């Protein structure tokens, strides 16, 4: 995993995108579930590869495609996906030279924390097959999954992403993966920080 710089940082966005994904037509029945995280993260990665613009998610807490439940305002899976994207993926986009294919949508950016290194997102959209990546050194891994595609609760490294009793956000911490082969199970979205 040695990406080449694809575009330089540009703080003046050129494209502003609204009504993306599930917003058109009132949303889909799975927009509030883990199943939609694949679309959301793929959209963020693909959009970043072509512009430094902005994606506006038009609904915070209304209907099925809102980031929060419209009844109790609990964060849905896409909320946590966008939160992790913003915490991990930096503004400089790298070309991974990996073609998008089933089982491996690979995106690479600078690290959002400003430290040297690279942040990757690998989306394994295969419902049945794992995929493998090679890590050149130990890495921090945030692996998103769920008990079922239509689950309303997403897991990060096996821990449910739900609010605490005091409505605080959960602590989202990585696990360390040693250098070498890392197997990514089917139907997972994995952030890898090197």
Which ranges hold each PLM region?
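Acidic, Ser/Thr/Pro-rich beta/coil linker or hinge segments at domain junctions
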Residues: 135-184
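Glycoside hydrolase catalytic-domain groove-lining segments
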Residues: 1-25
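A structural micro-motif
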Residues: 13-14, 53, 139
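Carbohydrate-binding surface patches
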Residues: 101-137, 141-148, 187-191
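Short, well-ordered loop/turn elements at secondary-structure boundaries
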Residues: 11, 49-51, 114-117, 185-187
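Aromatic/acidic polysaccharide-binding cleft in carbohydrate-active enzymes
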Residues: 17-108, 116
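C-terminal non-catalytic regions of proteins with extracellular/luminal or membrane-system context
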Residues: 86, 93-98, 132, 168-169, ...
């Amino acid at each position: 995993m040695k990406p080449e710089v694809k575009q330089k940082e540009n703080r003046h966005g050129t494209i502003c995108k609204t009504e993306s994904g599930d917003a058109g037509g009132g949303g889909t029945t799975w927009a509030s579930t883990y199943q939609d995280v694949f679309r959301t993260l793929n959209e963020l990665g693909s959009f970043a590869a072509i512009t430094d613009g902005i994606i506006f998610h038009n609904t915070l807490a209304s209907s099925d495609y809102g980031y929060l439940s419209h009844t109790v305002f609990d964060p849905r899976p896409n909320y946590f996906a966008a939160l992790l994207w913003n915490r991990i993926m930096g503004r400089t986009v790298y070309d991974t030279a990996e073609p998008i294919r089933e089982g491996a949508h690979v995106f690479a950016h600078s690290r959002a924390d400003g430290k040297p290194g690279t942040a990757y997102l690998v989306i394994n959209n295969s419902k049945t097959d794992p995929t493998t990546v090679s890590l050149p050194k130990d890495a921090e891994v945030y692996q998103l999954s769920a008990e079922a595609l239509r689950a309303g609760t997403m897991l990060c490294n096996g821990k449910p992403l739900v609010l605490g009793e005091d409505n605080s956000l959960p602590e989202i911490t990585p696990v360390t993966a040693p250098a070498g082969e890392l197997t990514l199970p089917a139907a997972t979205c994995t952030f890898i920080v090197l």
